[in-house]
């Protein structure tokens, strides 16, 4: 894609900056460089909002990898997830991890950038603020590692943002630890590595909510140049020339099946073999209708002194078996409002029959009972319901019958919070109970029916 196209994308993203309906939504971008060489170790872009939380930790300290026999990977497809898209891509000296989810919409979301330097030793105390030339000399960074291209800054300004290149940067340091929204799980901390954070100092006397620093524009540029879609939840690009361990934690507001997966392997195309270890753990929380996913990814060079050559072919590992469309921009609450309205109508009709027969009415089941059709006359209307061999009554919806018959569907329906529904997860049923005569008389007087 040409530079002009990137400029157009950045201008477009800048024009809708902060227009998302979710005030807590933010896209955090990270660039971590090696202090000894100045080379980029990792760049990451993470989405978070009031319910979605994402964090990661990167370290060059790789522990012991498993001792079992390694597989040789040419291509890998393991359908662990059917609700998110998870893909690992190995190409040349770069590894990319991409996670996409239809609970994510980055359109109109504000961006934040974080520039960091990883060091295996504690450097002598730095001043609280340093200029760009000192950053390049002390940390070996190029100016292009610090700022986005000038034409990208100009494109952002044309899109209604206000950005001017900074002269000074605040410098802070800490032990290497988790970055992002670390409330997902307990943060990881390494006492053997240090992170230096370089934060731009605004170079403008007057600021407003459209004033941004250059790292925010650099984050917009990463979205454009990496061709990240609006449903991108997490994106990580790793330098594959050095050993590393990266842990990524995500909390996604949907129920996915509990799962664990691990694999120890090498790639078939690598001229300088490396060992890789991937572990994935998926932990659903039915009470909060969310799932925590943890990925651990380790790489260890087998021949550290050998010249590293590029992989000619791209090798991918895909862990998704999606059955839902992506790249559809929409109001995330709109589908749920439609479902809620349909269920209200279904429940209202079921409640009418339930009150008349004065018996619990099952409105959804993941089972397949043997049912006999029954009818109920309501004035000039005839309502159909069913009865099983035990005399239990059913008022089932053809729409709900099309849903998967599993506990995830039960959890999803539970999240819609229909007030009269009673959930029996053990039996795999949702039912309603008949209202008392006093309640029905009161409703009749209020003319609520």
Curated annotation (Swiss-Prot):
Name of one Pfam family that matches: Tospov_NS-S_N
InterPro entries found in the cross-reference section: NS-S_bunyaviral, NS-S_N_bunyaviral, NS-S_WIV_bunyaviral
The family this protein is said to belong to: Belongs to the tospovirus NS-S protein family.
UniProt protein name: Non-structural protein NS-S
Species in which this protein is naturally found: Impatiens necrotic spot virus
The protein's role, per its UniProt record: Forms filamentous inclusion bodies.
């Amino acid at each position: 894609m040409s530079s002009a196209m990137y400029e157009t994308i950045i201008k477009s993203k800048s024009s809708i900056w902060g227009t998302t309906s979710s005030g807590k939504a933010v896209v955090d971008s990270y660039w971590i460089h090696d202090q000894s060489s100045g080379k980029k170790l990792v760049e990451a872009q993470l989405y978070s909002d009031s319910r979605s939380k994402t964090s990661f930790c990167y370290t060059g300290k790789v522990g012991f990898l498993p001792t079992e026999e390694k597989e040789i990977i040419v291509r890998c497809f393991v359908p662990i997830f059917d609700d998110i898209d998870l893909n690992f891509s190995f190409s040349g000296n770069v590894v990319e991890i991409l996670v996409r989810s239809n609970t994510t919409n980055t359109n109109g979301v504000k961006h934040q950038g974080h520039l960091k330097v990883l060091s295996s030793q504690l450097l002598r105390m730095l001043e609280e603020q340093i200029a760009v030339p000192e950053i390049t000399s002390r940390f070996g960074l190029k100016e292009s590692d610090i700022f986005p291209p000038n034409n990208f800054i100009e494109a952002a300004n044309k899109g209604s943002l206000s950005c001017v290149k900074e002269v000074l940067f605040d410098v802070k340091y800490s032990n290497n630890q988790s970055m992002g929204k670390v409330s997902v799980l307990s943060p990881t901390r390494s006492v053997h590595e240090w992170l230096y954070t370089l934060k731009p100092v605004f170079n403008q006397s007057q600021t407003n909510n459209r004033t941004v620093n250059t790292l925010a524009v650099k984050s917009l540029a990463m979205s454009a140049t990496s061709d990240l879609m609006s449903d991108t939840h997490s994106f990580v690009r790793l330098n594959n020339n050095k050993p590393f361990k990266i842990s990524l934690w995500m909390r996604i507001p949907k129920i996915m099946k509990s799962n664990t997966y691990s694999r120890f392997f090498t790639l078939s195309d690598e001229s300088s073999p490396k060992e890789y270890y991937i572990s994935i753990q998926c932990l659903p929380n039915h009470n909060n209708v969310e799932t925590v996913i943890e990925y651990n990814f380790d790489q260890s060079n087998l021949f550290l002194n050998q010249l590293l050559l590029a992989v000619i072919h791209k090798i991918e590992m895909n862990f998704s078996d999606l059955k839902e469309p992506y790249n559809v921009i929409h109001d995330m609450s709109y589908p749920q409002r439609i479902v809620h309205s349909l269920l209200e109508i279904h429940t209202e009709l079921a409640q009418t029959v339930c009150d008349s027969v004065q018996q619990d009415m099952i409105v959804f089941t993941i089972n397949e009972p043997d049912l006999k059709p029954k009818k109920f006359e309501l004035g000039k209307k005839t309502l159909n319901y069913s009865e099983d061999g035990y005399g239990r009554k059913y008022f089932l919806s053809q729409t709900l019958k099309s849903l998967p018959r599993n506990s995830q569907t039960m959890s999803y329906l539970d999240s819609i919070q229909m007030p009269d529904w009673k959930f029996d997860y053990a039996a795999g049923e949702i039912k309603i109970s008949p209202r008392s005569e006093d309640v029905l008389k009161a409703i009749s007087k209020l003319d609520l029916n």
